[in-house]
Amino acid sequence: MTSTLERYQRIAPLYDLLDLPFEYGRYRRIRPLLFEGLSGHILDAGVGTGRNMPFYPRDMRVVGIDLSPAMLARAERRRALSAATVELRHMDVTRLDFPPASFDAAVATFLFCVLANDLQVPALRELRRVVRPRGSIRLLEYVRPRSRLRRLSIAVWQPWVAWAYGAGFDRNTEAHVSEAGLEILDARFVVDDLVQLLTVRVPG
Ligand SMILES: C[S@@+](CC[C@H](N)C(=O)[O-])C[C@H]1O[C@@H](n2cnc3c(N)ncnc32)[C@H](O)[C@@H]1O
């Protein structure tokens, strides 16, 4: 079976091209919402090719981590587009090499729809550990849509998305948040009933 690492090593050279219609049709409009009201030292988990970078506010110091060196190499090229200071590290979100409370906040975009179900809680616990008490975690994720029509269209896309990205539309990240000891402050749809922005708080 192909691992997540192998998948992203394979798809990295094509990732931005394949994602282009979604990036410009959907994501660019919503990425800035992630950073509203955040400042200081921020973790971008699963930074990918660095698509969030143009939206990092100037006064942030961001550390982007990713499992795939090939995706990180693409992100490195995009670093110049960021107004913030950006450091990139090769790391697994379920085993972060940072001391507790290292960050003021963490963001992850389309990471949890890629992580297998049994990794969701361990990854959320790691984010909880490295973000300071009362800090924020923001997640932008695909969720299983309510409408039948969208579920049908997703069923058509699912085999390709699973093969290429290892992504699923059936992850229940919102439910795993409380299991990881985090508190949901806000959960709202930002693209139809497909993409959700979750704002979560670390207890403290
Ligand atoms: C769908 S891409 C999203 C990339 C980027 N956040 C974006 O918004 O375009 C998912 C990314 O998560 C990374 N990833 C998958 N599993 C990971 C893990 N366990 N730890 C860190 N990164 C991981 C992949 O290598 C890939 O770059």
Identify the role of each PLM range:
Residues 165-181:
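Short alpha-helix
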